Amino acid sequence: TPDQSSAASDVYKRQSDGRVFMIEASEVTRSALSTIDVTQSVCELSFDQSPACLVSSDAELVWQTIYRGRAIQAADTLGAAQYMLDQAVAYSLDRKQFNRVIGSFQAVKHMCAEMASQLEPCRAFAWYAGHAFDESTDDAPLTACHVKAHLAEVGQFVAKTSTEVHGGMGFTDLVGLHYWFKRIGFNRQLLGSPEAVRHEATELE
């Protein structure tokens, strides 16, 4: 789980029967986990015989939380991918080869254009996912599945292509692209891989 280190943060536990319980943060032991994404803290929660308060017996509450989380993850991936695109464009207009900026070469232009063309429609997609939950539309869960899966794929493409535009520099700490590359990779798996959420989407349709 993402690390909510504040002592005031409560922990919610879902039972197999769908019931949700709230546990005081002081009753939970947190163990930090190492992941590929160093920009986010993740921890394992453990508790035994901890006092808990029943919050809900509605199993749908948990799924609605997961769906909302997927929409948020998609928006986070969108932001990371946009940053990588911006960095690729800026680098292509600064880096020179053969006495010309590499952004003037057709191959590099195409790489940047392909990233932009795939990423731009995702803005409206992510916006609608948020709107669907704001308005509690019937297609909100389905939209969350699709936007999570789609942004995972587009984000991976942008991360890979942006790194290629930078050449060998893209893999160095000096540029820092690898932080966002790993962020996108981490988001891809969190709350369900594209394959898993698309399978869920077929069951929702």
Predicted regions and their residues:
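Single conserved hydrophobic/aromatic residue that forms the stacking wall/gate
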Residues: T1-Q15
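Exposed loop/turn and edge beta-strand positions of beta-sandwich/beta-sheet ligand-binding modules
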Residues: P2, S41, C145
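Flexible, small-/acidic-enriched active-site or ligand-binding loops
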Residues: S5, E24-L54
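Short coil/turn linkers that connect adjacent helices within long alpha-helical scaffolds
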Residues: V11, I36, R95-F98
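A broadly conserved detector of short glycine/acidic/proline-rich loop/turn motifs that flank catalytic sites
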Residues: D17, E27, Q49-P51, T77, ...
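Hydrophobic beta-strand positions in blades of beta-propellers and related beta-sheet-rich domains
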Residues: G18-M22
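Acidic-glycine-rich active-site phosphate/pyrophosphate-binding loop
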Residues: S50-E60, N99
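Alpha-helical interface subdomain recognition
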Residues: T65-E205
